[in-house]
Regions:
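Secondary-structure transition motif
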Residues: 1-147
Length: 147
C-alpha cells in the first residue's frame, strides 16, 4: 500500500516571514490534510505533532512514485522524462479524472497529456526539476524545457 501524504505551501514564492529574526523564504509542509473550503486548508504533521495553514491551491498528493534521485513525486511537480537517452519532454504531474490516474501534462489544467504514470516506467526515466507553483517558467505548451 502506498503512503498517503500531502504537501502544501504556507507562503507564496517570494513572500518572506521572520523566524527567530531570520527572513525565511516560502516553504512546504508535509503530512495529513484537513481540506478547507476557502483559500486555506490545514496540513498536520506527526513528528513533531503540529498543524499549518497552507494555501489550498498548492496542495498536492504524493503519487506513490519516487524519481531517479530518490525524491517523492507529488501532484504539481514538474518532471523531465528521458527514456533510453531519448528526451520525452517536461510535464506537470496532475490527477486525470477521466482515466482515474496521475498523468504528466505539458502545462497545468491542459488536455495535452505526455504520459500516464502507469506507463512511465522506472524511476531512472524521470527527474523532478521543480514545481508549478515556484517554477512555472519551466513549463511550455510544447513540453520542452524552458530556460
Amino acid at each position: 500500500m502506498r503512503e498517503l501524504l500531502f504537501r502544501g505551501q504556507t507562503r507564496r514564492k517570494g513572500q518572506k516571514v521572520r523566524m527567530h529574526g531570520t527572513p525565511v523564504e516560502s516553504n512546504w509542509v508535509y503530512g495529513g490534510i484537513f481540506p478547507g473550503t476557502g483559500d486555506y486548508s490545514v496540513i498536520y504533521t506527526y513528528d513533531p505533532i503540529d498543524k499549518y495553514a497552507v494555501y489550498t491551491d498548492t496542495i498536492g498528493q504524493f503519487t506513490g512514485r519516487i524519481d531517479k534521485n530518490g525524491e517523492k513525486v507529488f501532484e504539481g511537480d514538474i518532471l523531465h522524462v528521458t527514456v533510453d537517452g531519448q528526451d520525452w519532454g517536461v510535464g506537470v504531474v496532475q490527477w486525470c479524472d477521466h482515466d482515474q490516474c496521475f498523468s504528466l501534462f505539458t502545462f497545468p489544467n491542459s488536455n495535452h497529456r505526455l504520459i500516464d504514470f502507469g506507463d512511465l516506467g522506472l524511476p531512472e526515466y524521470y527527474e523532478i526539476i521543480g514545481n508549478m507553483y515556484d517554477d512555472p517558467h519551466l513549463l511550455s505548451a510544447g513540453g520542452e524545457i524552458n530556460a
